[in-house]
Amino acid sequence: MASIASSVAVRLGLTQVLPNKNFSSPRSTRLVVRAAEEAAAAPAAASPEGEAPKAAAKPPPIGPKRGSKVRIMRKESYWYKGVGSVVAVDQDPKTRYPVVVRFNKVNYANVSTNNYALDEIQEVA
């Protein structure tokens, strides 16, 4: 019976409380069901027909464009003062090393890519 209630609770997106270990009987369990806040807020947030929600303006892209050539300015890097091409740039401002750069030659560990911070690279024309 408890497994049926828990499976229904999972399907409906509800939370349950696991059995309390302070009960004297090891088989006694208690099921507490609380409705999720997101499920209750979803119908209220529905917009009237005919109105499309306005999209938030995108911030300008961070870092160099994909495929552009960059010079490495990190002194301890194997590719210091070398030129590589940008593979990807993480647009999250909290990322420490958002720019992935690929090089033609490999380092001692046979790796040809590395991540760099925005102040450790310089775009080459």
UniProtKB/Swiss-Prot annotation:
<protein>
    <recommendedName>
        <fullName>Photosystem I reaction center subunit IV, chloroplastic</fullName>
    </recommendedName>
</protein>
<dbReference type="GO" id="GO:0015979">
    <property type="term" value="P:photosynthesis"/>
</dbReference>
<dbReference type="GO" id="GO:0009538">
    <property type="term" value="C:photosystem I reaction center"/>
</dbReference>
<keyword id="KW-0603">Photosystem I</keyword>
<comment type="similarity">
    <text>Belongs to the PsaE family.</text>
</comment>
<feature type="region of interest" description="Disordered">
    <location>
        <begin position="42"/>
        <end position="68"/>
    </location>
</feature>
<keyword id="KW-0809">Transit peptide</keyword>
<dbReference type="InterPro" id="IPR008990">
    <property type="entry name" value="Elect_transpt_acc-like_dom_sf"/>
</dbReference>
<comment type="function">
    <text>Stabilizes the interaction between PsaC and the PSI core, assists the docking of the ferredoxin to PSI and interacts with ferredoxin-NADP oxidoreductase.</text>
</comment>
<dbReference type="InterPro" id="IPR003375">
    <property type="entry name" value="PSI_PsaE"/>
</dbReference>
<dbReference type="GO" id="GO:0051219">
    <property type="term" value="F:phosphoprotein binding"/>
</dbReference>
<keyword id="KW-0472">Membrane</keyword>
<feature type="transit peptide" description="Chloroplast">
    <location>
        <begin position="1"/>
        <end position="34"/>
    </location>
</feature>
<keyword id="KW-0150">Chloroplast</keyword>
<dbReference type="Pfam" id="PF02427">
    <property type="entry name" value="PSI_PsaE"/>
</dbReference>
<keyword id="KW-0934">Plastid</keyword>
<keyword id="KW-0602">Photosynthesis</keyword>
<feature type="compositionally biased region" description="Low complexity">
    <location>
        <begin position="42"/>
        <end position="57"/>
    </location>
</feature>
<dbReference type="GO" id="GO:0009535">
    <property type="term" value="C:chloroplast thylakoid membrane"/>
</dbReference>
<keyword id="KW-0793">Thylakoid</keyword>
